Amino acid sequence: MTENNDIKMVIITGMSGAGKTVALQSFEDLGYFCVDNLPPMLLPKFIELMADSKGKMNKVALGVDLRGREFFEHLWGALDDLSERTWIIPHILFLDAKDSTLVTRYKETRRSHPLAPTGLPLKGIEIERSLLTDMKARANIVLDTSDLKPKELREKIVHLFSTETEQAFRVNVMSFGFKYGIPIDADLVFDVRFLPNPYYIPHMKPLTGLDEEVSSYVLKFNETHKFLEKLTDLITFMLPHYKREGKSQLVIAIGCTGGQHRSVTLTEYLGKHLKPEYSVHVSHRDVEKRKGH
């Protein structure tokens, strides 16, 4: 492999209950290929899979489960093998927390510690901490999550592992037709069926909001201008707060009856309004469906 095909690998390990699930979700939001609970003995095979992916797996986060002493022999061997492969850039992220915090988290979730399934969680924590001493010493980054909320842990991981491009907050604005269903991935849905409908003007019926005649018609009404003023004010207010909460993207869906005229016009307008400040993708889900409103 060449330097251009370097693979960035993060091995996530640490104390059970310290936040591995949140960490993996954070890496997934950053575009990493994530695998949870990968047994260390499978790491060499996984490395071969990455090498054969031809650049498709250039960022990988692995949640490694270390609940038995025999696992460490496989792990140390795999890590030594990684150090000899110049095309892999490995990092070990160790998540830790105070014993009292871990006990509280287990009580709150009503789960048993994996190393003390029938006993007190504190005993399992003691055993696990002893097992992971060498692993913690070998880690590139140790994060104490004792005083971190899930959102704060995500923010730390984004700060530590993302590039400037990956930190960009993405906004997807899409049009749709209610007759075909509301998009299941929409975060915000706006209904513009109250606006005058170009569909009932015969020569506009086969056109869409991408045509200037249709967009000019929809935008000429006073109610359209008032709605767009309120909509852009609302979205402009909300986006920084969504970003601060740790969301990597927001899907805004604007719907009319058939998804051809009004929603398309307003989606195009909103997308152009937001593009100077955000990374915006505009799409029209139902614009090709010519079945009428």
From Swiss-Prot:
Disulfide bonds: none annotated. GO terms for molecular function: ATP binding; GTP binding. Keywords: ATP-binding, GTP-binding, Nucleotide-binding. Gene3D superfamilies: P-loop containing nucleotide triphosphate hydrolases. The keyword Transmembrane does not apply. GTP binds at residues 65-68. ATP binds at residues 14-21. Belongs to the RapZ-like family. Displays ATPase and GTPase activities. This is Nucleotide-binding protein BA_5384/GBAA_5384/BAS5004. It comes from Bacillus anthracis.
